[in-house]
Amino acid sequence: MDFKTFGNIGSPTLLLIPGLGVSYEIFMPLIGLLEERFHVIAVQVDGFTLGQNTEFTSVDDQAQQVCKYIKEDLGGHLDIAYGLSLGGKILSQILERNEVAIEHA
C-alpha cells in the first residue's frame, strides 16, 4: 500500500480510497480542484499499485494498513474520508474498527 499526498499540510485532511482495479489516479481531477484547500491523501490499494508488485489480500488487511497510516502519520484523526466502490468497503471496515477518528465519511 502506498499513500500519495497533495495540498497543504495543516489544512483539513481528506482521504480518498479508490475502487477495485483502479489506481489513485482516478481521483486526480478531484485532487486538482481540492488541493489548495485540503491536505489530500490518496490511497494506492495493494494489488493495484502502479509500478509495484503488490498483492491484494483482504479488505480487512487494507483497512488495517490505512488505520496504521492515520495513527502514525496523522495523529489518529481525519477530517473527511471517501471510498469509491471497493474503497467504500475498506472505509466501512476502518469505521467498524473504531481505531481512528474520522469527522465525516
Feature names for model-found ranges:
Residues 4-52:
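Conserved HGGG/HGGXW glycine-rich cap/lid loop of the alpha/beta-hydrolase fold
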